[in-house]
């Protein structure tokens, strides 16, 4: 019986890992491939005009948007949920949108978040995600992919 229980735990972990990998797959249909997150504006204004300036833009975008923003937000979200402070999650949503300077990036984040919510709720029963969707619909929060992913 112990062997069967061990196999069950291993399969459960494998299934959870497969689910995470699916959600993180670049081909997952959340629409993020449709958004340049402000890069088109930089191209139009000749801020990005060669491989070097593009590389610099990617480096800055990753360091300032994804690592120090989205990654930190997810960590803060986990801490808030561990402490039972769901209201803190909604504050984090507002902070993420407020600190996103480029309008294109803010709009893209909202669109990707709404698509993520729809697909995730089609696949999983996540009560906090349902609450988040209602708050977005009632314009209490904006909607951000980092919050969706964290929830």
State where each predicted segment sits.
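Internal, conserved structured core segments that host functional sites
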Residues: 71-72, 76, 85-151
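Glycine/small-residue-rich interface belts in oligomeric ring/scaffold proteins
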Residues: 19-86
